[in-house]
Structure formats: C-alpha cells, structure tokens
C-alpha cells in the first residue's frame, strides 16, 4: 500500500512537472509572438526614418519683409502722405450715409430715425474732430501692434490692435484726425484715469474729441459721427456724451442713478468743458470720498457718475446715450445682452472679438462697393451665352 501510494504520488508529481513545463514553454512562446507583433506594428505605424517635424516660425518676423513698398510712392511727399486717407475716403464715399438723411437701417434691419428738430450737424466736421486711443501699456517692441515695425498678422491679431485699427480706419474714411497716445502711469491711480487728462489736452486743439477704449469699435464704417450726434441730440451747449451702463445691480451710483460708461466719450471744446475735465482729474484730491475710486472699479468712470455729473448739471451739459446704441455687444449672455452696441460695440468681456468685427465691417463695405462697380460695368463684364450651342463659334469675348 505504501509502495502504491508513493508510486501514485510520483506519478502525480511527474504530471505536475510536465504541466508546469508546458505552461512555461507556452508563456515564453506567447511573449515572443507578442514582441514580434509589437515590433512589426510599431515599425509600420511609426517608421524609424520619420520626416523631421516642421520648424515653428515666428509669423511676424518671417513676414517682416512684406512691408508696403516705399519706392512706388509719388514724388510729392505731401501727396503720398495723404494718399491712403484720400483713397479710403473716396472708396467709401458712395457708401457714406448722408448727414441730413433722417432714417438709417442697420445691416440687421433695425430702423433708427432722427427727429426733424435734431438735425443740427449738417456738414462734415473733418479735422475739427480727433479720435483718440489712450493707453499706458503701448510698447513698440511688442509684435502685432500698431507701434511695431513689422506688418500685422490678421489671424493672430490681438483685440487691442483690432480696436486701434478700427478707430484709425473710421477716422480716415470720414476725414477726422486720429491720435494714438501712450500716456504715463498715474503713480496713485489705476491706468484708466489717464483718459480724462489726455482728453482735456486734446480739447485745446480740436473742437470734438472722441475717446474710445480699445475694445470699443464702430460697427458701421459708413455712418458718420455727425449723424450719430444728431441722433443723440448733441447740441452746441453739450459738454460730453456717454452711454448708459447696463442695468445691473452694481452699475448704479450712490443716488440710485445708472452710471455712465467712459469706454466711448464725445467731448466738445469749451471753457466749461475744460473746467469739467479739470474737476474730473482732480476729483480724488479735492472731493471727499472720490479717492475711493483711485483703484476700485470702475475708477474714473465711477468718479464721473458719482460726483462730476452732478456738478455740471445744466440741461445739455451731459448727454446720456442709450446703452443699446453705444455700449454692450452681440456676444455677451449668448447674444441676449440688453445692450447690443448697435453703433459702438463695447466688448468688455469679449475683447478678442474686435478683429472679427473689424474684418466684418471692412469686408461688408468692400463687397458692396465691388458689387456696385460690377453692376456699373455689367454690359462689359457679363456675357449671357446660355443660348449658344456647342461647338461655340463667334461668341466674341472682347
């Protein structure tokens, strides 16, 4: 019995050893097959001699040689300096809305009509108007900006540059002056406080100063400022015109009135206007409580609405522009913002959208202009050969 038991155990031990050996051999074979398959697949999908990855280039630097040629400029320096503004003015001239035409319909079909007794500005103001961009952050070393020497790259254009371009183009179309001002930082205030100081100085040389934030853009390049001034009832006695802010809880002053937004300001020169802007600039130093707005949002905007507008409160001193006309934009709240910025789109939370608005406004105008030119020459440019049979002979394309 013992012998039989040992024999039986020996047989079982032998069977187990054979089984383990077979399992081990199977594992080795499986691993080899896996490695061979992995190598085959990896070399087929990821060849060893891969082409080198494309070298990432700086688009601005690469295209810096593509500056407009200066050797084709006219010999008359004065003429060449004014060539582009004159060209843009002539190009847009057939599209510009007449100043005395009371009705304007936007591209979205919105109808605006000026009351007959508000048609005051009937002639172009030209160089009496200056559009000003004021900023403390301007740097001529920063690429893709107005001050940088290399040509702009539109696909990567920053929002701030898009705003500056929009203002400059609008000024050239309508014959206004334009200035881009790099202001010094206030040592004891937020950077936006420089706007009243620069505007006050510009009012010494121009009758009207239009101050805009870089994220506020003109949506209709064909609509003159004079027409908008008529719509907003700007009179010869008006000191400034600004748009209401949005009807949100934080946008009311201490007296319960909706504050005005300083992202778009029309200022008219007069001694009283100088006094207003001086008081505005001095507000944190001379008015108790105004220093609260040195760094607290909305800075100079809150100071004006909480204090200055109540000092200059004659009937026409401060014109309140409807928020929907010159504040807000079409992007906020998924396009459902109460203020759509119909004439001046202020993109405070969508600053990156200004290049899109710039491109849209330019291409809309150019497409209409080119289309009109085609129809003007349609007898020479269009041939109706639909009644011809093939092979065609004698069509006479000249």
Predicted regions and their residues:
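Loop/turn elements at helix/coil->beta-strand transitions in domains of secreted/extracellular proteins
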Residues: 126-129, 174-177, 205-208, 214, ...
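Short coil/turn segments at secondary-structure boundaries
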Residues: 143-147, 183, 223-225, 278-280, ...
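GT-A fold catalytic core of metal-dependent nucleotide-sugar glycosyltransferases
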Residues: 188-277, 281-282
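Catalytic core and acceptor-binding pocket of nucleotide-sugar-dependent glycosyltransferases
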Residues: 21, 26-27, 197, 267-398
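Solvent-exposed, acidic/flexible segments
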Residues: 160, 189-192, 258, 296-297, ...
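N-terminal Lys/Arg-rich, disordered targeting/topogenic segments
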Residues: 1-19
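Active-site-proximal beta-strand/loop segments in catalytic clefts of secreted hydrolases
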Residues: 134-137, 181-184, 212-214, 243-246, ...
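N-terminal anchoring/stem segment of glycosyltransferases
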Residues: 14-205
């Amino acid at each position: 019995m013992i012998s039989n038991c040992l024999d039986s155990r020996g047989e079982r031990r032998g069977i187990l050893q054979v089984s383990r050996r077979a399992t081990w051999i199977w594992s080795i074979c499986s691993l080899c097959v896996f490695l061979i398959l992995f190598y085959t697949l990896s070399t087929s999908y990821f060849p060893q001699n891969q082409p080198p990855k494309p070298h990432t280039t700086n688009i601005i630097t690469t295209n810096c040689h593509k500056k407009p040629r200066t050797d084709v400029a006219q010999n008359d320096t004065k003429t060449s300096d004014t060539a582009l503004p004159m060209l843009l003015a002539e190009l847009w001239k057939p599209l510009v809305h007449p100043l005395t035409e009371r009705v304007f319909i936007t591209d979205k079909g919105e109808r605006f009509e000026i009351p007959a007794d508000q048609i005051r500005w009937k002639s172009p103001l030209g160089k009496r108007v200056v559009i000003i961009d004021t900023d403390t952050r301007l740097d001529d070393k920063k690429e893709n900006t107005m001050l940088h020497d290399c040509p702009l790259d539109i696909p990567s254009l920053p929002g701030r540059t898009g705003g500056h371009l929009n203002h400059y183009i609008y000024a050239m179309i309508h014959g206004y002056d334009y200035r881009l001002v790099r202001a010094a930082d206030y040592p004891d205030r937020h950077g936006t406080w420089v706007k009243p100081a620069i505007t006050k100085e510009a009012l010494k040389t121009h009758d009207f100063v239009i101050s805009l934030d870089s994220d506020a853009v003109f949506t209709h390049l064909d609509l003159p400022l004079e027409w908008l001034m008529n719509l907003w009832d700007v009179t010869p006695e008006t000191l400034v015109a600004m748009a209401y802010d949005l009807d949100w809880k934080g946008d009311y002053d201490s007296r319960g009135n909706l504050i005005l937004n300083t992202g778009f300001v029309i200022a008219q020169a007069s001694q009283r206007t100088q006094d207003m802007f001086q008081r505005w600039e001095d507000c944190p130093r001379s008015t108790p409580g105004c220093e609260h707005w040195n760094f607290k949002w909305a800075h100079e905007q809150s100071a004006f609405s909480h204090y200055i507008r109540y000092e200059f409160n004659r009937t026409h001193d401060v014109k309140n522009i409807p928020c929907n006309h010159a504040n807000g934009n079409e992007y906020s709240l998924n396009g459902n913002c109460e203020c759509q910025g119909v004439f001046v789109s202020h993109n405070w939370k969508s600053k990156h959208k200004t290049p899109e608005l710039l491109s849209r406004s330019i291409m809309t105008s150019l497409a209409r202009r080119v289309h009109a030119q085609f129809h003007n020459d349609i007898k020479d440019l269009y041939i109706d050969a639909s009644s011809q049979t093939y092979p065609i002979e004698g069509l006479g394309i000249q």
